[in-house]
């Protein structure tokens, strides 16, 4: 399945030291920040912090070049556990576009841990793969990677992982092969071609995501089935 091949491109498990991991995270955070795709927390990037489901939706809308549309969304948000304002706009927009179904019909669990499987599912959608049309399924999106010990998919995602996966996805071709995700964002005017090239995300080849199990020293985090 093309989706599994893409997942294997995005997720490559290698041994990497904590200092080296932190340096990669910081570099990639700067690259995304320069393009307006990743913002700090007010006291830095907090790359060692856990990524939440709301973080995943925000990053997805940016990766699709649709953040302005999300922030101006004035339709209903079906999730009673999402705060009013920007969180409601992001999640309401994502639901309306079919990017998320929540964890139930009325809850999204915005502060819940974002798993590798959830975020790679979001990235696959950003790349033009449609699980609704059978291009892939949430349940199978990382099964091959897990079976090959490429990814311990039961662990939650850290913000540094979110950044690194996003950089890899930006350099990955869209499902229709017309361009990379970064090139498509440049065409939409999210950033310029020159800015994309300056950050090495356009014309620089592809960078595989490197997962370090050293981050995941705690107990496994259970996943929720919906996305």
Each model region followed by its residue ranges:
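Feature responds to low-complexity, polar/acidic, surface-exposed segments characteristic
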Residues: 1-28, 34-89, 97-117, 124-157, ...
């Amino acid at each position: 399945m093309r989706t599994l091949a893409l997942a294997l491109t995005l997720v490559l498990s290698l041994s990497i030291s904590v200092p080296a991991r932190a340096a990669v995270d910081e570099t990639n955070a700067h690259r995304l920040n320069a393009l307006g795709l990743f913002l700090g927390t007010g006291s830095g990037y907090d790359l060692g912090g856990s990524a939440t489901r709301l973080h995943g939706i925000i990053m997805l809308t940016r990766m699709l070049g649709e953040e302005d549309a999300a922030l101006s969304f004035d339709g209903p948000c079906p999730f009673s556990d999402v705060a009013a304002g920007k969180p409601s706009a992001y999640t309401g927009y994502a639901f309306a576009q079919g990017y998320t179904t929540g964890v139930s019909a009325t809850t999204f669990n915005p502060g819940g841990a974002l798993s590798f499987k959830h975020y790679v599912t979001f990235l696959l959608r950003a790349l033009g793969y449609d699980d609704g049309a059978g291009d892939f399924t949430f349940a199978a999106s990382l099964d091959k990677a897990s079976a090959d010990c490429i990814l311990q998919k039961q662990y939650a995602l850290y913000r540094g992982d979110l950044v690194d996966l996003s950089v890899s996805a930006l350099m990955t071709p869209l499902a229709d092969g017309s361009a990379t995700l970064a090139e498509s964002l440049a065409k939409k005017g999210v950033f310029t071609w020159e800015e994309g090239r300056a950050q090495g995300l356009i014309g620089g080849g592809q960078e595989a995501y490197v997962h370090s199990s050293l981050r995941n020293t705690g107990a496994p985090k259970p996943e929720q089935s919906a996305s």
